[in-house]
């Protein structure tokens, strides 16, 4: 079986809090988690966990977050074909009462076109 996923790479920061500060307030969250996100990225990692070596075309910046992502994709056996951007994309996720608010910081100014693949 072969699988190819195309999408946006996100570093997801999820935090649990009972209060969202405004203005000059500060507040300490109860818990947090950091993971890789984006629909295509999530699907590629799921396939890899199931023993299928997927191909993934997704954004990647040459910064520490992008290098961390590349390293983890390599560890999972994902054939990663990066679409270069200047900075990594982040999602800040705030779950509350079964719903979730999301703030995204995304660089979608691609430096290069889609890579040519021979798979």
PLM features: residue spans?
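Conserved N-terminal subdomain of the carbohydrate kinase-like
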Residues: 26-27, 34, 49-119
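Glycine-rich phosphate/adenosyl-contacting loop at the front of the ribokinase-like
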Residues: 1-57, 64
């Amino acid at each position: 079986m072969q699988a190819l996923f195309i999408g946006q790479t996100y570093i997801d920061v999820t935090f649990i809090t009972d209060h969202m500060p405004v203005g000059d307030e500060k507040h300490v969250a109860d818990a947090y988690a950091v993971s890789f996100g984006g629909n295509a990225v999530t699907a590629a990692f799921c396939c890899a966990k199931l023993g299928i070596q997927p191909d993934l075309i997704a954004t990647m910046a040459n910064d520490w977050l992008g290098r961390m992502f590349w390293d983890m994709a390599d560890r999972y056996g994902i054939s990663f074909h990066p679409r270069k951007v200047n900075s990594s994309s982040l999602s800040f996720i705030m779950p509350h009462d079964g719903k979730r608010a999301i703030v995204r910081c995304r660089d979608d100014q691609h430096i290069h076109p889609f890579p040519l693949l021979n798979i």
